[in-house]
């Protein structure tokens, strides 16, 4: 479930009337504004829509229980109190006091299909960075110039788009769900869990190379990974869990001693928070968004991006130093419990009030 969907759910629980709209023609406005650009002219609505539905793995009242089970939603992801719309235009059946775009594509819809002053753009990371969008980064740059009030989730974005006078809130995790199992097993084991997600910005190739170094150099290492990275690209010595359910991810965290995030660029990634809440020690590449809550040598080990060897070295160091492991684990769990669903919703509401 994506961060925007988690926010919608929590706001609904606080008795706000919330709706999620999936555009059935997501690039319609961009194609009209930039008719000469072939790389958006050829993009149809269905791939974008299907990708959003599959990647977010959440359920709402229009999905039958069997599909809900297949999508791996097995804890409190009930969206019965959130309205869901599939529409070509925002104006079709949706009348709201405020409209929030959650990426560069929907930003064009909010800017051109709502009244002035009602539109916001929640940007989780710099979508104009080529490592994220490649040859579409120019379109994201255009989105940041739209007359929308900008809301961001990390300090780097505050500085990068300072001229837009953005406001800040932090995302969070379901703290009652993510919790440790047996810390004794973690302290005596060599189980490493790696996030392997699709897209250049997620750094899966560096995670896999770090896993190879761990496998070759750390005795009795047990390496697991999860994500949506292509299965045929993951070596057989890695126990790979492709698109696991929420319950399965929790069990992976609980069994792991060290969690590795190899990403190049993130907004404010939740997996390290989930892992720390579940008792893991985190090793992360310095992918921007982790700076919100990770502090090197205090609650994690942070290493340069695009460097498999330093990821491996950090894991090895933690496994060899039990005192360091315990310090990072204890501080990590304390940190994670500050970033909760409830705090996320409260910070968001405060940020929105600031922009009225």
What is the predicted function of each stretch?
Residues 251-256:
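Short alpha-helical donor nucleotide-sugar binding micro-motif in glycosyltransferases
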Residues 151, 183-202, 208-213:
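Conserved donor-binding/catalytic core segment of Leloir-type glycosyltransferases
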Residues 281-284:
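Short hydrophobic beta-strand element within catalytic cores of glycosyltransferases
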Residues 341-356:
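C-terminal alpha-helical cap of glycosyltransferases
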Residues 130-134, 165-189:
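Acidic anion/phosphate-binding donor-loop and adjacent secondary structure
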Residues 264:
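Aromatic "clamp/platform" in nucleotide-sugar-dependent glycosyltransferases that forms part
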Residues 296-297, 301-308, 317-322, 337:
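Conserved acidic donor-binding segment of nucleotide-sugar-dependent glycosyltransferases
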Residues 86-95, 127-152:
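Membrane-proximal helix-turn-helix segments that form the acceptor-binding/catalytic region
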């Amino acid at each position: 479930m994506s961060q925007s969907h988690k926010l919608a759910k929590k706001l609904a629980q606080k008795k706000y009337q919330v709706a999620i709209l999936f555009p059935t023609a997501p690039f319609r406005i961009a194609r009209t504004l930039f008719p000469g650009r072939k790389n958006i002219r050829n993009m149809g609505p269905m791939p974008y829509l299907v990708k959003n539905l599959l990647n977010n793995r959440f359920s709402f009242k229009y999905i039958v229980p069997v599909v809900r089970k297949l999508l791996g939603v097995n804890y409190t992801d009930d969206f019965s109190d959130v309205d869901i719309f599939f529409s070509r235009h925002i104006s079709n059946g949706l009348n709201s006091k405020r409209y929030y775009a959650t990426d560069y594509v929907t930003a064009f819809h909010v800017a051109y299909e709502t009244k002035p002053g009602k539109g916001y753009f929640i940007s989780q990371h710099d979508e104009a960075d080529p490592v994220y969008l490649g040859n579409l980064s120019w379109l994201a740059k255009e989105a940041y110039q739209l007359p929308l009030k900008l809301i961001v989730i990390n300090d780097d974005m505050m500085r990068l788009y300072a001229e837009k006078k953005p406001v800040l809130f932090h995302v969070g995790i379901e703290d009652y769900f993510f919790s440790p199992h047996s810390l004794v097993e973690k302290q005596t084991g060599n189980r490493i869990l790696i996030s392997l997600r699709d897209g250049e910005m997620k750094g899966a190739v560096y995670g896999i190379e770090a896993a190879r170094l761990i496998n070759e150099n750390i005795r009795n290492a047990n390496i697991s990974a999860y994500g949506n990275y292509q299965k045929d690209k993951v070596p057989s010595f890695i126990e790979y869990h492709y698109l696991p359910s929420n319950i399965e991810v929790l069990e992976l965290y609980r069994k792991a001693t060290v969690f590795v995030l190899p990403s190049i660029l993130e907004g404010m990634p939740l997996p390290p928070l989930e892992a720390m809440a579940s008792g893991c020690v985190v090793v992360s590449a310095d992918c921007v968004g982790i700076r919100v809550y990770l502090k090197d040598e205090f609650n994690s080990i942070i290493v340069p991006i695009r460097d498999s060897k330093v990821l491996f070295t950090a894991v090895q160091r933690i496994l060899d130093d039990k005192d360091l492991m315990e310090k990072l684990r204890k501080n990590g769990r304390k940190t994670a419990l500050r970033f909760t669903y409830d705090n996320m919703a409260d910070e968001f509401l405060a940020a929105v009030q600031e922009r009225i």
